[in-house]
From Swiss-Prot:
This is UPF0310 protein Kcr_0474. Belongs to the UPF0310 family. InterPro entries: EVE_domain, PUA-like_sf, UPF0310. Pfam families: EVE. SUPFAM superfamilies: PUA domain-like. It comes from Korarchaeum cryptofilum (strain OPF8).
Length: 147
């Protein structure tokens, strides 16, 4: 079993919840092609501005992959402006394992996460990625911090 951190926006998190599917752009084919049924995916929602407030990055749920990767170009996901008209066509069907009552504050965990080697420039470990594999101990740390 492999553990994944899937990086998305608040808008696309709502779609993941509704449709039980994860999708990435074509350029992330190498990462998603390694996802297998039974793998566990943590959904990480990026930081965003809400009015004058900043809502920090958070982990909101655990899902299990229940399909192989498949291609579907239907436009269910919202493409951020910087990505143009992206359809996120490479997809995996999901089964919810746990949707956290309260999202996990990702920044608080950075000092203890093994996959983040540079704690001061931690965003570099996520920037430009749709998903990344994480060690089991990081998966357990994140999920044990949830409610």
């Amino acid at each position: 079993m492999t553990y994944w951190l899937c990086i998305t926006t608040q808008e696309n998190w709502e779609i993941i919840k509704e449709k039980n599917v994860w999708g990435v752009p074509e350029r992330h084919k190498n990462a998603i092609s390694r996802v297998k049924p039974g793998d566990l995916l943590l959904i990480y929602v990026k930081q965003r501005g809400v009015g004058k407030e900043i809502e920090g990055p958070k982990v909101v749920a655990v899902y299990e992959a229940v399909s192989e990767v498949f291609r579907d170009s239907s436009r269910i996901f919202k493409s951020p402006p910087e990505m143009g008209n992206e359809a996120f066509p490479l997809r995996v069907r999901l089964r919810p394992v746990k949707i956290f009552e309260e999202p996990v504050d990702f920044k608080k965990l950075i000092p203890d996460l093994k996959f983040i080697e540079n704690k001061r420039k931690w965003t570099g470990h996520l920037m430009g990625k749709a998903m990344r594999e994480i060690p089991e101990e990081d998966f357990k740390l994140i999920t044990s911090s949830s409610k």
